[in-house]
């Protein structure tokens, strides 16, 4: 009956004034409180040792504004009562109300020493808002005073107790006290408890930058990357200046970790947007990315990759001149590496300077192809086509000048910008073969083979011959002959024409003879027979293969070899 009902609030959280009917009810409520007082007094007469009745009586006296009587009754009960914490808490509130701050603080200190802060919860439903506010303000100020003047875990724990009183007195919505207590828990290593307090703030204010930053840092210390990045990004979007100051307050190692996490998140998000969204310039996420990139630059202006990220976002938003000027302002001299040059390359594509674009992009295509795969997504289909044609032509020119290493980068750019066009895969494979990087050359030929048209048998046969030739150069004769056999069975004339070109029919037939003889010695007659027949399709005049076939017939009598 003594507990107050919550005051109505409008949709903005502002308390509404009482209606006349509410004011009429106040007299009824006062009568109820008087009745409670009389009943509690009667119970005390029946049992003078009943602490619960005495506390109920003092609460009624408080609500009837009979403060001195309530104070006197509580003071008398304190000496021999088992309910020390509830009595001390009520006395403290009354002392604050009377203006005796020192006495009130001493009483609160005793409650803290007892360690029973839960006694405040029922009191908060009885005491008036202005009186609760007095306790809240005092306890918060006292906690801050302790934190500013003292050091050590014991003082932090004492401050937490005062802050807990302030939070309870506020009804659980004291933002400043929740923030301070969360930070205290963080200092004590109680990260999850700190996160609980930050979440309490965010429940009322989802975009509170202080709570988001603090919570993000707790997740950082727990090595929870996804959660930390989520909160820090929200904090930056809510109040970038504050979030940046908070990041700067961290130790250098922690600053590096959190900024790299945010950077990687931005990179991933940018790549996903470029892949999934054809009309990405209008996507609001790009504006958020721009804010995050600007914040990263402000946290560490010397980090080149942050400037590169910001440039990429400008390019994605089709702000080409702004991106060009930003690159020129941010990088000069030795700072211009292949990643910076590649961004100039993308801009030159936009400006239709295709040869210059290829020159700027090709080095990165050779060193970090996965990054160029992202950059070409800034280009439309026509721009990519123009780029891979220019890169392919330049690669061919360099081959003629016997500059295979330079040509390789251009072919790599052509492969990437053409989305693994078999033509450029074959050209790069030839270049790699000349440079004796046989394993990479085979990978390119395999990719070309995977993109075969089922009707183009001539091209398929030529690719299998190319792969066979590379395998020969890498001294894998067994695997090489297998590829040539595939080519001959697929399109004989085209395969023989390729073999004539390299390594030559006579030479290859000799290799087939060696492999077939090895199979024969291992008594693998069927394999030896097939190898001999295929070798004779390459060079029908090879006498060794003819003699081997005759030996197989004799040795394998009774075995089916064809």
Swiss-Prot record:
Protein name: Tetratricopeptide repeat protein 34
Name of the encoding gene: ttc34
Organism expressing this protein natively: Xenopus laevis
Region ranges (Disordered): 1-30
Entry keyword Repeat: yes
Keywords assigned: Repeat, TPR repeat
Bias kind Basic and acidic residues: ranges: 19-30
Highest taxon above the source species: Eukaryota
TPR repeats: 51-84, 175-208, 210-242, 304-337, 388-421, 423-455, 461-494, 509-542
């Amino acid at each position: 009956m003594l507990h107050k009902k919550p005051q109505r609030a409008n949709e903005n959280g502002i308390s509404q004034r009482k209606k006349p009917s509410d004011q009429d009810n106040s007299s009824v409520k006062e009568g109820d409180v008087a009745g409670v007082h009389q009943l509690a007094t009667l119970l005390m007469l029946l049992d003078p040792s009943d602490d619960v009745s005495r506390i109920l009586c003092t609460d009624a006296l408080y609500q009837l504004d009979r403060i001195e009587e309530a104070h006197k009754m509580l003071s008398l009960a304190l000496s021999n009562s088992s309910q020390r914490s509830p009595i001390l808490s009520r006395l403290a509130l009354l002392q604050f109300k009377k203006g005796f701050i020192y006495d009130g603080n001493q009483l609160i200190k005793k409650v803290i020493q007892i360690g029973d802060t839960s006694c405040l919860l029922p009191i908060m439903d009885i005491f008036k808002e202005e009186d609760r506010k007095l306790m809240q303000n005092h306890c918060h100020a006292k906690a801050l005073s302790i934190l500013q003047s003292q050091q050590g875990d014991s003082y932090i724990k004492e401050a937490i107790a005062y802050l807990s009183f302030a939070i309870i007195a506020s009804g659980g919505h004291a933002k400043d006290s929740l923030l301070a207590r969360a930070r205290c828990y963080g200092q004590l290593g109680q990260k999850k408890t700190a996160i609980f307090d930050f979440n309490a703030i965010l429940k009322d204010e989802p975009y509170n930058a202080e709570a988001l930053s603090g919570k993000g840092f707790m997740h950082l210390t727990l090595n929870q990357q996804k959660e930390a990045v989520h909160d820090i990004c929200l904090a930056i979007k809510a109040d970038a200046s504050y979030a940046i100051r908070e990041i700067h307050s961290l130790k250098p190692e922690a600053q590096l970790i959190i900024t790299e996490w945010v950077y990687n998140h931005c990179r991933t998000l940018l790549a996903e947007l470029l892949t999934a969204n054809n009309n990405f310039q209008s996507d609001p996420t790009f504006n958020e990315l721009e804010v995050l990139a600007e914040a990263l630059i402000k946290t560490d202006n010397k980090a080149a990759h942050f400037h590169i990220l910001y440039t990429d976002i400008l390019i994605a938003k089709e702000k080409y001149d702004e991106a060009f000027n930003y690159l020129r302002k941010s990088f000069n001299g030795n700072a211009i590496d292949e990643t910076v040059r590649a961004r100039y390359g993308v801009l030159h594509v936009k400006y239709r300077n295709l040869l210059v674009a290829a020159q700027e992009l090709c080095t990165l295509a050779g060193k970090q192809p996965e990054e160029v795969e992202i950059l070409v997504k800034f280009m439309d289909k026509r721009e990519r086509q123009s780029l891979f044609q220019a890169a392919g032509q330049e690669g061919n020119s360099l081959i003629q000048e016997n500059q295979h290493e330079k040509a390789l980068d251009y072919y790599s750019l052509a492969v990437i910008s053409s989305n693994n066009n078999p033509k450029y895969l074959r050209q790069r494979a030839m270049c790699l073969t000349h440079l004796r990087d046989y394993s990479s050359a085979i990978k390119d030929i395999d990719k070309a083979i995977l993109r075969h048209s089922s009707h183009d048998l001539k091209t398929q046969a030529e690719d299998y011959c190319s792969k066979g030739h590379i395998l020969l150069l890498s001294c894998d004769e067994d695997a090489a002959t297998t590829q040539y056999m595939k080519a001959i069975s697929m399109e004989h004339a085209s395969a023989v024409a390729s073999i004539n070109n390299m390594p030559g029919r006579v030479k290859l037939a000799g290799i087939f003879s060696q492999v077939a003889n090895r199979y024969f010695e291992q008594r693998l007659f069927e394999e030896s027979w097939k190898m001999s027949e295929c070798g004779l399709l390459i060079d029908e005049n090879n006498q060794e293969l003819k003699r081997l076939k005759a030996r197989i017939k004799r040795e394998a009598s009774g075995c089916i070899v064809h």
